[in-house]
């Protein structure tokens, strides 16, 4: 009998399934039996391929950032600060209301439910802080180009955009419809610094 049977699962597919469980349940709420069942593997195979639960969660977060939340990087490349905000909010709506996705934001949900893993919570908070820094730097560029009204703080604007994003995520988790969230986005855009509403 041959030794070393080949793995009978696709690690990418298994990681996608783990991502969905963490996204739906959060880190603390995702049990090992639920994870192994969703991934279609046993515990030894999970540990061999992905490490422990904490390491699996880190890999799932990376997959989330590169996949479903990949719209963030594209939004930051938009030509104007207002378009950056619009694309971030629209991306959040699209992701949160897609029937194929669990609602809400994995990183927000994960950072609020890491249980005893203080190290993991700090990593997620650091990830969110990095996102805020990138957004602030983008708005600083816009301010230097004369795109924002004088006196508008790039840091405050970044916090505002993220607060709306987080609100969209939480509202979607609470059952808000796509149409309702689109109205929230349009209302937020009307309050953009220097944006004049005509009609």
For each predicted feature, which ranges?
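Amphipathic alpha-helical packing segments from all-alpha helical-bundle domains
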Residues: 118-145, 156, 186
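Helix-turn-helix
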Residues: 2, 13, 21-55, 59
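Hydrophobic alpha-helical connector segments
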Residues: 59, 72-103, 154-161
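N-terminal intrinsically disordered/low-complexity leader segments
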Residues: 1-9, 151, 196-199
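Amphipathic alpha-helical segments used for helix-helix packing
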Residues: 84-85, 98-122
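Amphipathic C-terminal alpha-helical segment
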Residues: 95, 113, 141, 161-179, ...
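Generic hydrophobic, amphipathic alpha-helix propensity
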Residues: 10-19, 35, 60-64, 68, ...
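Hydrophobic alpha-helical segments that form the core
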Residues: 103, 109, 152-171, 183-191
């Amino acid at each position: 009998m041959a030794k070393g049977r080949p793995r009978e699962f696709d690690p990418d597919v298994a990681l996608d399934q783990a991502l969905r469980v963490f996204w739906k349940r959060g880190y603390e709420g995702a049990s090992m039996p639920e994870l192994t069942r969703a991934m279609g593997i046993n515990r030894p195979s999970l540990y061999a391929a992905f490490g422990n639960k904490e390491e699996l969660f880190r890999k799932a977060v990376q997959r989330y950032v590169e996949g479903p939340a990949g719209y963030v990087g594209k939004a930051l490349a938009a030509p104007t600060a207002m378009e950056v905000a619009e694309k971030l909010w629209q991306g959040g709506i699209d992701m949160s209301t897609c029937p194929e996705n669990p609602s809400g934001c994995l990183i927000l949900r994960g950072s609020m439910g890491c249980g005893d893993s203080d190290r993991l919570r700090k990593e997620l908070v650091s990830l969110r802080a990095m996102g805020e820094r990138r957004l602030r730097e983008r708005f600083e560029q816009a301010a230097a180009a004369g795109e924002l009204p004088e006196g508008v703080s790039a840091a405050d604007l970044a916090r505002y955009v993220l607060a709306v994003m987080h609100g969209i995520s939480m509202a979607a988790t609470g059952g808000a419809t796509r149409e309702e969230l689109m109205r929230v986005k349009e209302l937020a855009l009307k309050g953009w610094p220097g944006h004049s509403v005509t009609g």
